[in-house]
C-alpha cells in the first residue's frame, strides 16, 4: 500500500533538480528548448562509450507517457540540431527513450507523484556520515523529502529528511507495486523488453 497521490498532469515548465555536467550538459542545453516546443520534458542526458559513443536522451510528456512514435518524433527533430552544433565532436549513436518504470527522479514533482514507492537516493554531501539511501520516499515538504528505511538496524534512524538541493541522483526501484501503478497510470514503457522504448540513430 502506498501513499502516492492519484496521477495528475505535471507542470510542463518545472525545472529539474538534477542536471548534467560536461558534454551531456551541452547536449541538454541544445535539445531542451525543442523538446519543450514539441510538448515533452527532458528527463536526463547521458553520453557513454557504448558502441563507440552513444548519446542517450530520456524524455516524457508532462503526464509521464512516452510512446515509440514519440521517441521517433523527438529523434527527427533534435538530430539535425545536434548535427549543427556538434557538441560530441565525433561519430555517435543517438538513443531517445522513455524514463522506464524504474525511472530517474529529477524534479520535485517526480518525488511527489511517486511518493510511497521505493527509491535509491544519492546525495552530493553526506548526511550523518552517509550519502546513499534506499527506502520509501514521501511527498516533499518545503525544501526536503523524507525517506523511510524499512530495513534500518536497531539503534539507527528509521527515516531521514533529505534536502532536495543536496540530491545528486535518485531513481525508483523496480517492484511489483511500482509495475502495477505504472500500468494503471499508463506511464509504463512500450515495446521494449528492457523497459525503455528507443529510437536509435547513427551519426
Swiss-Prot record:
GO CC, alphabetical: cytosol
InterPro entries in UniProt: Ribosome_maturation_RimP, RimP_C, RimP_C_sf, RimP_N, RimP_N_sf
BP GO terms, sorted: ribosomal small subunit assembly; translation
Keywords from the UniProt entry: Cytoplasm, Ribosome biogenesis
Disordered: annotated span: 184-203
Localization, UniProt: Cytoplasm
Annotated Gene3D superfamilies: RimP-like superfamily, N-terminal
Job of this protein: Required for maturation of 30S ribosomal subunits.
Family membership noted in the UniProt record: Belongs to the RimP family.
NCBIfam families: PRK00092.2-5 (NF000932)
Protein name (Swiss-Prot/TrEMBL): Ribosome maturation factor RimP
